[in-house]
Every structure is written in C-alpha cells, then in structure tokens.
Amino acid sequence: MDVPRTLLVTNDYPPQVGGIQRTLEALVRRLPPNRVAVLCPNAEGGDAFDRAAPYAVYRQPERFLWPLPEVRRRLHQAVRSFGADVVLFGAVYPLALLGPSLAETGTPYLAAAHGFEYWLSIAPGTHALVRRATSRAARVPVMCSAFIARVVRTAVPDDVPVSVMYPGADLEVFRPDLPYEDLTDLHGVADRPLIVCVSRLVARKGQDVLIRAMPPIRRDVPDASLLIVGDGPDRDRLVRLAADAPNGSVVFAGQVSEGDLPRYYRAGNVFAMPCRSRLGGLEVEGWGNVFLEAAACARPVVVGDSGGARESLAPGETGLLVNGSDVAEVAGAVGSLLADPERADAMGRAGRERVVRAFGWSRAAEQLAGWLREA
C-alpha cells in the first residue's frame, strides 16, 4: 500500500478501551508500519502496548492532551523526528486546533470526526471551534455515518471536503464458527433463547427498554433471556429495573475481555441494542459498530433508529429497525426473531455477507490511504 509518512495525533488510543480507540488502531494496523507513527497520551499498560506495536509510538506524559503551547511544540518536534508528510488528527476536538499551525509550516493535516462531533457541530460555541480546527484541513474523514457527516458538514468550511468512512469489523476475529457454550453455562443461560446486548451502560443505548420488554417477550417465547454485556454509569439503575423482570430473565455479564467479546456476540440468537436519541436530539447514536460485529458473527440485529445507527443494517434483510423508545415495538421485533429461528439464521447469514462485502477494515484502510495521498 502506497502511503505518505503519516503521524496520527490522538487522545484516543489503546490500551485505552473504546470505539474510537479500536477504530484508529484497526486502521493504523493495516497501514505499512514503517510509514505510520502515533502520538498519544499516557495510559495504564501503554509501555507494554508500545513495545509490541510494529510502528513508532510517541507516548506523552499527560493522561490527556490539550492544544497548549508545550503540546504544540512536541507535536512539531514529532513531525520533524518522524519525517511526517501528513498528520491525521484522530478527532476534530481538541487536538485538531493545532492543525492550522502545521499547515502554516507546510505540513498538511486531516481531522477525523466521530459521533462526538455531532453536538460540537450544532452547538453555537463549539460550532466555531470545529470551523477553526478544520479551517486549513485537507479533508475531514467522518469515521461513522453519513448522518453525522451531514451535520459536521454544516460546521466545516465549504472548501474543505467532508467524506464518510464507515468503520469495519475484523472478519478474522468476529466470525460464525466461534465456540460459546462455556459462556452460556457460566451465566446460567444455556439452552435458552438468548438476546445479547453489548454496549456501555448508558441511557442512550436502550438496555432499560430491553429489560422492560422481557415480560412480553417471555409470554411469546418462554425461557427467553437477556444477557447484558458491558459496564457503565447506568448499571445500578438497570440492576434495580431488572429486579422487576421475570425471574432469571436478565443476566449482567459485566465488562468482558476483548478476546471473549466475539464469543458473546455468537452466544446470542439475536443481538439487540435499541438505541434512542435523547435531550431533544442533542444526544444520538453516531454509528454503532456493535451491530457490524454481531452481523460478522452471523447474528441478526435489532437496531434502534437513532442518528446513524440505521446505516449499519439492511432493514428486513440483516435485521430489524425499531423505535428504541417503544417497549412494545422492541419486544415484538426481538420476540419475532426468537420465535422464528430459520428467519433469524437467514438474517444472520445475510448480515455476515454484507459485512464481508462492504465493511472490512482493509477496505476502510485503503480509503484512508487514498485521502492521505491526496493531502
């Protein structure tokens, strides 16, 4: 792959855990290791990660980097040290505010956007920050959905291209042949019709609606269970809510290892995350890579219609799109798939085929490499 020498500058990078971290690392890993380097903040386990990385990592002492004069100085030093032809900022805010200073010295830059840039682009004060950070950018790759790209476009100067780059799923990691029986045994849900939800436990993701949907689901599909994977600030509320669900119908797996995560997707008969928009539309789901990962494991998906989430599925073919605030609609969609295993399996197979065809990480890396060359 022909790629100019590229320095990724980001606050979000492994061994930190998160969707942006996984996206950026998946892209870097698919670029030639001698043509890419990463400048990122300190993190627990960072030294071990950096030693194992096949590319250079300029790990900074701070836990979070702000666009301050000292960080600017170190950034310019890293550009010179690595001999970078182009800089890719992992997010528009805050570090891409250093981008115009790079352009002044002749180093082009790209500023990536994710779901967070949605509200940055619509709020008056932060709208101006987005415009300033991207004022001299060669391009703004939106690494989530066309929905987010349309909103970001309103904050980016007209002469700066804004392009969509859908995240992918690692097809060697997320696949249909994974064993999972030990996991269902561990959580006491073996041989039950199983719904799996993988996500951070926050209100937008809709775990509360899934819990409320369990009584009607169980009326149609006896013994159906919900396995909630992940942790977050909403956990205590969800545990209290689950106490009112049918006995044994809701199980919390907590945070699981990256190695086991694909097997949890595979353990379910249906994957569901009925995400919903909140705060009058200020909080939306930018994309939802969990839907792609579940589909890559050949499981049908039930997707809440918030923001760009609908772009992750082919409705009626690879899964079902629902109003994530409507308990009855969510229960009907999930229950219909649990009650019809043949239909669910067909959707799962179609989902895997769609991910293979259109959402592999190698495809995304080639797209990014093209934009880096054009910069």
PLM features per residue range, with description:
Residues 9, 188-205, 211-214:
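Conserved donor-binding/catalytic core segment of Leloir-type glycosyltransferases
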Residues 89-95:
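Short His-centered aromatic/hydrophobic patch
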Residues 147, 168:
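Carbohydrate-associated surface elements
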Residues 223, 329, 336, 343-357, ...:
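A short, well-ordered alpha-helix in the C-terminal region of glycosyltransferases
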Residues 236-262, 270:
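Nucleotide-activated donor-binding/catalytic signature segment of Leloir-type glycosyltransferases, i.e.
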Residues 266-284, 299:
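Acidic donor-binding loop of glycosyltransferase active sites
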Residues 291, 296, 300-303, 313:
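Short hydrophobic beta-strand element within catalytic cores of glycosyltransferases
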Residues 314-316, 320-327, 336-342:
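Conserved acidic donor-binding segment of nucleotide-sugar-dependent glycosyltransferases
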